Amino acid sequence: FTNEKISKLVTALKSSKKEIDRSYESDDWFQWSEGRVSLGKNKSINSSSRDFHSYGISVGADKIKDDDRDAMHGYVFQYANDNVDIGSSGTKLETDAYSFALYDTKLRDDHFFTDALIGISLLDIDQKRVIYGNILEGNREGQQIYGSFNFGKRIVDEDLNLNPGLKLDLGYTKLKAFRERTVVGDSLADALLYKEQNIKSALITLGVLLDKTEKDKEEDEIINHHGRLEYIADLS
């Protein structure tokens, strides 16, 4: 391991694992899960302030390929909720996304690696606008297909490790047409009609990750420094 902390931890685990002997086969699937929560606020002089919060959960499994021990593939189910409050009048936008994706990663010769992910999502969007006390609501459905492809190389040095890479993100989103409805009286003067939308996206990211390890022999400490530099081009 190039990371000294991980190497030290693995050594400790091996020494304490005398009575446990579990050998895994290539047919074994390894389950995993993760969750996330995000909170934020955006204030602007020229537009309404925005408070947003989101949360999500992912459950997946992956396995090492039978015919290639340097490759792994898997799948993941995801649920995400994004909620944005706009201004102080009650206008808000809430999106529920249900996703399924397949992914694959492979370590190649000379520390080259490739990652790929392809997925689909179902979107359920609830919109609420408040105009001079008139409350307008609407529900919109959508479908999405997306893919991400990453190519990189691990450059190992005694003092500094570099990971230059190139990533391509592609997406296609289709949103159904809908019309707002009022919940106050019968006034539809402010109601908007949204036509069907087809949105294409393409991003190219050039970047480099770097990490450096320092040892303090007197204190028996290992300090890791991490950094990232990226350039993102929107080709949409």
Spans of model-derived segments:
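Membrane translocator/pore-forming domains, dominated by Gram-negative outer-membrane beta-barrels
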Residues: 25-236
